[in-house]
A protein has these predicted regions:
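N-terminal nicking endonuclease/strand-transfer module with a His-rich metal-binding environment
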Residues: 1-177
Length: 177
């Protein structure tokens, strides 16, 4: 299993891609209403960011306002999975991701942990257009419902998750730097 995460400035386009891609299935909408358009999802995220703008960025909009995560289990791992299995994977990934101390990477105590579980996000299941391999896209608001801005750095630099059989933490994942 491989996953990558980064903060991005094109959140509206990322959400639109995640939700509207051909054969995409919505796995979960966290703290967002069901059956709304990608534009409405992004709009609701921006309302939360505006509400807390003074507190989180001295009133200025965040440049990179969405956390984009892609999770790709191997074809062998995910063969026969149901939508409930994909939901479990996304929930477990978010739980583990939130538990990682990132302050060493960011050099800022305020970036110690993410709080995705208490953030607006959408999880969509995609099929690779060439191989047909299934993978998840998660697009999350960088501002959680507790008024905190998460991860001011680009996470993709060197942060990858691999499922290993030798070295594991309690969730069965190791962080490769």
């Amino acid at each position: 299993m491989i996953a990558k995460a980064s903060t991005i400035s094109h959140g509206a386009n990322a959400i639109r891609y995640s939700v509207n891609k051909e054969k995409a299935d919505i796995v979960k909408a966290n703290l967002l209403p069901d059956n709304i358009s990608p534009e409405a999802m992004y709009g609701r995220m921006m309302l939360v960011q505006k509400k807390y703008a003074e507190k989180i960025n001295k009133g200025r909009p965040l440049g990179r306002n969405v956390i984009r995560i892609e999770i790709s289990p191997s074809e062998e791992e995910s063969r026969g999975w149901t939508m409930d299995d994909w939901l479990r994977l996304s929930n477990e990934f978010i739980r583990v991701f939130d538990s990682i101390d990132l302050s060493g990477k960011t050099k800022r105590a305020s970036s110690q942990h993410t709080n995705l579980k208490n953030s607006q996000y959408i999880v969509a299941l995609h099929r690779d257009s060439q191989s047909g391999i299934l993978h998840l896209h998660i697009d999350a608001n960088r501002v959680d419902m507790d008024e905190k801005s998460m991860i001011a750095i680009r996470l993709a630099r060197g942060l990858f998750w691999l499922r290993t059989s030798s070295t594991r933490n309690e969730a069965g994942y190791s962080l490769k730097k």
